[in-house]
């Protein structure tokens, strides 16, 4: 009986791993990897939940930004949907006022619409972004001064 128990203890983890290898399963509970500061200031983590391919042409990525982080102006060749999972952030489209986004909000951004989204000055934010397979088109840096002016206008909202 002890030998059987030992065999089960040894084999069960490998069987479980083999079962997991049969499926494409990811978790939005994972923080992901820290993103290099290429198009943002501050700390950001990206978790590629599903990467677009020939059969499914949408990327689904979880992004988490620490408080007081920026993300540059950008656009996508397809619509983008943001589902805010936790925290408080900002969202703005070009030539429109910035707004506060928070846990539970779902934002739809039309294709080719220049916009940015990130954490608020005092809170981190985590969201799932759903967008097409074409690469993000980065258009303009967000300066610390611009971000701070938006944060000042939205403070307390």
Which role fits each region the language model picked out?
Residues 76-90, 94-95:
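Glycine- and acidic-residue-biased ligand/ion/polar-headgroup-sensing regions
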Residues 59-76:
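Conserved short histidine dyad/triad with adjacent acidic residue
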Residues 108, 122-140:
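A short hydrophobic beta-strand segment most commonly corresponding to one strand
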Residues 4-13:
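Sec-dependent N-terminal signal peptides
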Residues 95-112:
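Short acidic-glycine-tyrosine-enriched beta hairpin
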Residues 17-57, 137-140, 144-157:
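A short, N-terminal "cap"/entry segment at the start of jelly-roll beta-barrel domains
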Residues 73, 91-92, 114-120:
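Short beta-strand His + acidic residue motifs that chelate non-heme Fe in jelly-roll/DSBH
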């Amino acid at each position: 009986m002890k030998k059987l128990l030992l065999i089960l203890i040894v084999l069960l983890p490998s069987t479980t791993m083999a079962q997991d290898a049969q499926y494409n399963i990811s978790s939005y509970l994972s923080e992901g990897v820290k993103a290099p500061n290429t198009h943002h200031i501050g700390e950001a983590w990206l978790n590629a939940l599903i990467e677009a391919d020939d059969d499914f042409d949408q990327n689904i990525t979880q992004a988490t930004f620490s408080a007081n982080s920026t993300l540059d102006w950008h656009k996508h060749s397809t619509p983008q949907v943001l589902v805010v999972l936790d925290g408080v952030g900002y969202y703005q489209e070009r030539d429109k006022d910035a707004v506060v986004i928070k846990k539970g909000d779902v934002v739809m951004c039309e294709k080719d619409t220049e916009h940015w989204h990130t954490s608020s000055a005092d809170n981190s934010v985590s969201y799932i972004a759903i967008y097409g397979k074409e690469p993000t088109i980065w258009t303009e840096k967000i300066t610390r001064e611009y971000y701070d002016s938006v944060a000042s206008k939205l403070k307390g909202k």
